[in-house]
A protein has these predicted regions:
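A short beta-strand-loop structural module common to alpha/beta enzyme folds
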Residues: 54-64, 211-219
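A short, active-site helix/loop in glycosyltransferases that binds the activated sugar's phosphate group
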Residues: 105-107, 128-130, 141-163, 198
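Extended catalytic core of nucleotide-activated donor transferases of GT-like folds
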Residues: 3-13, 46, 56, 64-141
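Conserved catalytic-core segment of nucleotide-activated headgroup transferases in glycan assembly
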Residues: 37-40, 44, 151-226
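Nucleotide-sugar donor-binding and catalytic loop/hinge architecture
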Residues: 9-22, 79-80, 174-185
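Acidic donor-binding loop of glycosyltransferase active sites
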Residues: 228-234
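A short, glycine/small-residue-rich beta-strand->loop->alpha-helix junction that serves as a flexible
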Residues: 28-40
Length: 234
């Protein structure tokens, strides 16, 4: 092993020990709309940031909207870097954490000389952008963080040569019950808004005597609006 290589290796080890290595988290631009999966990523990044690690939010376009309209302003204090038009600084001691939806990005960064980790929150999206017959390990992603033991068991059956760890999403203290009785409101949150409307209309048709009950679609609300309405609901 030559002197130059030894020097680079020692520098990488030093950066890891001193928490100088970069930890990139790729996020989707929700254009100001609330999305639970993005909140989870920001929570992870901010926790590392608070503990002295060099956590960086990575997004695709330069006109990134951010999350301050629906999450706490503190999350925008994290360093943010766009992929578009910039050469990301990547070293062997760095880490890149990519959501399961971004199979095409995994392919693009497969040659990067850094640690690569998949963050899988929804198994529905695993095959969305992966080429047929391709697994994460073929792109150098040998580790995966997922959100439940059940999902871990499912992933282990289909993604070989990958190690899995479970980190359960946190729930903020704002999700607490009110001491006073709830109002006759039923809060509904579905992935597809059409499912919400089907549920509401079907309920009123089947139980016309309960038309005094109000339904509230919880999509697109900020965290504080969401928790406030949820506290008032059945």
């Amino acid at each position: 092993m030559n002197t130059e290589l030894i020097t680079k290796l020692e520098l990488s080890i030093s950066n890891l020990k001193e928490k100088k290595s970069r930890i990139y988290f790729l996020v989707q631009d929700t254009k100001g709309n609330a999305k639970a999966s993005i909140r989870v990523i920001y929570e992870m990044a901010y926790h590392l940031f608070e503990n002295g690690y060099n956590a960086i939010i990575m997004h695709e376009q330069t006109d990134y909207k951010g999350v301050s309209s629906w999450l706490d302003e503190k999350y925008m204090s994290l360093p943010h870097k766009p992929i578009e038009g910039q050469n990301l600084e990547i070293s062997p001691e760095d880490f890149m954490i990519i959501p399961e939806l971004y199979g095409h990005v995994m392919e693009q960064v497969s040659k990067f000389p850094c640690g690569k980790i998949v963050l899988c929150q929804s198994y529905d999206y695993i095959m969305e952008t992966l080429s047929p017959g391709t697994s994460w390990s073929q792109y150098g992603f040998l580790k995966c963080i997922t959100t439940s033991e059940e999902q871990k068991k499912y992933l282990e059956k289909i993604m070989k040569n990958v190690s899995f760890d479970v980190i359960t999403p946190t729930i903020s203290n704002s999700f607490e019950k009110k001491p006073i009785p709830a109002k006759p409101i039923v809060s509904v949150h579905t992935r597809d808004q059409r499912d919400t409307m089907k549920l509401i209309k079907s309920f009123y048709l089947k139980y016309p005597q309960f038309r005094w009950i109000t339904f509230r679609d919880m999509r697109g609300l900020s965290e504080w609006e969401f928790t406030s309405i949820l506290k008032d609901s059945f």
